[in-house]
Amino acid sequence: MNDSDKNVIRIFRLFRQYPTEQILEIIDGIIDRYGLSDSRTNGYAFYQCESARGLGTYNKEGYNRLRSELNNMKRRNDRYFFMLFTLIVFAFNNQIRFNEKREFNLPVGKRDFNNNMRNKVRHFAEAIKNPHIELSSNDFRRIPFDGLSEHSLIYADPPYLITCATYNENNGWNARLEKQLLAYLDRANDRGIKFALSNVLKNGDKENTILTEWLERNPMYIRHDLNYNYSNSSYHKKDRSKHSTEVLITNFE
């Protein structure tokens, strides 16, 4: 498992290192310390909030205090990454973003550490402890095909070139990298290695022509259109007619 964001891999390693129930206890302790909501226990009415509008108003003060203390920490130790993960749970759309000063700078989101999120963490923390899973934070262009075969599968989930997601601000992912990733997958295909690529073909009036032309040049690749509902996300488009076309592209049935 590889991610270019070293913070993500550090959190994964933390989840591998600590017993699952201890992870949950530490997160609960941070939530309690900063006075963040616990809708799993208390429900929404306790915080004078409705599910549709979310918990952002209630959590804003505690969230900002947690974020400020995290950004002032000198050591990036286990405590830092548990606090960072808790921020992500309460952040806008559960995303991660740092500014040029390496400060986490996302605003508070609508949700908290509810039952759904808690179960996801529990299941992931158990799965990541599998000793066969290797963790790395390398440039994808430097990941060799050594050891991979026709029984292997490469799953690529890059930042989406034509969206304005927080993880792709400041031109973190560009056309050159998009082309290099597609060329990397072509080389994998030439070696008989299976791949699956998550991406966006259209987003409103924008089209990922690099991806479209790549599919046209490679008719053997299979496009699977995905239909996701992001009704619980913190961001809602004003013009819902301008939808996004998300796809999974594979070189196998």
Regions found by a protein language model. Give the residues of each.
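Conserved proline-anchored active-site loop of SAM-dependent methyltransferases
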Residues: M1-K6, F12, F85-F92, N138-D139, ...
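Long, positively charged, glycine-interspersed low-complexity recognition regions
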Residues: L161, N170, A175-E253
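A structural motif corresponding to the C-terminal end of an alpha-helix
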Residues: K120-E134, A183-A196
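Class I S-adenosyl-L-methionine-dependent methyltransferase module
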Residues: M1-K129
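Short conserved loop adjoining the S-adenosyl-L-methionine
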Residues: I143-L148
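Mobile active-site "lid"/loop adjacent to the S-adenosyl-L-methionine
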Residues: E100, F104-R111, Y160-Q180
